């Protein structure tokens, strides 16, 4: 079953994106480089709960 989580900017902390991830337990969190409209640049976004 898919679980909806959000991606937060590592610099400013704003939650800009939502993604569907698998519900199984995993060791690492998803990290993607995406555009942050608050920082106005591409930053690393990490999976949050």
Swiss-Prot record:
Cellular component per GO, a single term: ribonucleoprotein complex
Gene3D superfamilies for the chain: Ribosomal protein L33
Pfam families linked to this entry: Ribosomal_L33
One GO term (biological process): translation
UniProt xrefs under InterPro entries: Ribosomal_bL33, Ribosomal_bL33_sf, Ribosomal_zn-bd
Gene Ontology MF terms: structural constituent of ribosome
Assigned keywords, A-Z: Ribonucleoprotein, Ribosomal protein
Domain of life: Bacteria
Recorded family membership: Belongs to the bacterial ribosomal protein bL33 family.
NCBIfam families in UniProt: PRK00504.1, rpmG_bact
Protein name: Large ribosomal subunit protein bL33B
């Amino acid at each position: 079953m898919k679980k909806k989580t959000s991606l937060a900017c590592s610099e400013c902390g704003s939650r800009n994106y939502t993604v569907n991830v698998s519900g199984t337990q995993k060791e690492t969190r998803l990290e993607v480089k995406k555009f942050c409209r608050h920082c106005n640049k591409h930053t690393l976004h990490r999976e949050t709960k």
